[in-house]
Amino acid sequence: MSKINLSTMWSSFIKKIAKTILVAIACISLFLTSSPAANAYPFWAQETAPATPREATGRIVCANCHLGAKLTEVEVPQSVLPDTVFKAVVKIPYDTDVQQVLGDGSKGGLNVGAVLMLPEGFKIAPEDRIPQEWQEELADLYFMPYSEEQENVLLFGPMPGDEYQEVVFPILSPDPATDKSIHFGKYAVHAGGNRGRGQVYPAGNKSNNTTYNVSASGKITDITFEEYVGNQITIETPDSETVVDLVPPGPELLVAVGDTVEAGQVITNNPNVGGFGQADTEIVLQDANRVKWLMAFFALVMLAQIMLVLKKKQVEKVQAAEMNF
């Protein structure tokens, strides 16, 4: 009986191990086969620049893959008080009538993504701190911190661009009274906004959303198209060697059989209709006591002005009385 139980347990254990291995293989296969068609959106920045998405030059790393330049805007209040919730808005405008080249070469709508870099201590507001009137506006939005150590750097997307050309981040300001590492003052805010797929993947290889060049000089002797693979351009060089260049589905060829080309010559159009842009602004973490003292100062100045006016009128009355006398 004991042998039968052990045999059954061992068989069950082997099946579980096999199942786990198969699932792992399937996941790895899915990852490897789908990555070439994946969109290069903000989360790729975590892979290429895990420490910070902003380079020493001030450029956000998303620009390394999204080579087209487009407008992005960021709006934050001029100043905020400690431990308060406010809106930071990143605007990613584009023409919603255009369509981009997808991974398989077909056309489709553009997605958008955003990176918001706030001062240290600022972070996404907890759900219980978000005002009720904001709930509907923020219902379908999901934000992700850049890393566990950087809650002040936030990622959004990809999401459908025709619905999210304005992304509202509900932000909670820090309180220097409870966190001694935070200080009142003026701070920089950086934002990046992307629409559409990138032209280069983080590994450096091209996507099918960019231009393609020939690798050798010579005469094009053949062009063959294979679905899901693309166009194979056969070039006969002056040395009678044969070179075959591959252009994936998406870009349109600008050459034909019989054309003579030079090495490095662009042989496709540029299908990219999207692009990346970044914007910088400032926000002041304001001390409430300073605001109170400032208001008191203004009140004192106004009172002094009123007293001066009254004093002036009093002097004028005295002067008028002396003249009559």
Swiss-Prot record:
Heme binds at Y41, C62, C65, H66. Gene3D superfamilies: 2.40.50.100, Cytochrome f large domain (2.60.40.830), Single helix bin (1.20.5.700). The keyword Coiled coil does not apply. The lineage of its organism: Bacteria, Bacillati, Cyanobacteriota, Cyanophyceae, Oscillatoriophycideae. It is a single-pass membrane protein. One of its GO terms (molecular function) is electron transfer activity. Keywords: Electron transport, Heme, Iron, Membrane, Metal-binding, Photosynthesis, Signal, Thylakoid, Transmembrane, Transmembrane helix, Transport. InterPro entries: Cyt-f_TM, Cyt_f, Cyt_f_lg_dom, Cyt_f_lg_dom_sf, Rudment_hybrid_motif. Residues 1-40 form the signal peptide. SUPFAM superfamilies: Cytochrome f subunit of the cytochrome b6f complex, transmembrane anchor, Cytochrome f, large domain, Rudiment single hybrid motif. Its cofactor is heme. It comes from the Bacteria. The keyword Signal applies. The gene is petA. It holds the Pfam family Apocytochr_F_N. The 4 large subunits of the cytochrome b6-f complex are cytochrome b6, subunit IV (17 kDa polypeptide, PetD), cytochrome f and the Rieske protein, while the 4 small subunits are PetG, PetL, PetM and PetN. The complex functions as a dimer. It is found in: Cellular thylakoid membrane. Binds 1 heme group covalently. One of its GO terms (cellular component) is plasma membrane-derived thylakoid membrane. This is Cytochrome f. The chain crosses the membrane at residues 291-311. It comes from Trichodesmium erythraeum (strain IMS101). Belongs to the cytochrome f family. GO terms for biological process: photosynthesis. Component of the cytochrome b6-f complex, which mediates electron transfer between photosystem II (PSII) and photosystem I (PSI), cyclic electron flow around PSI, and state transitions.
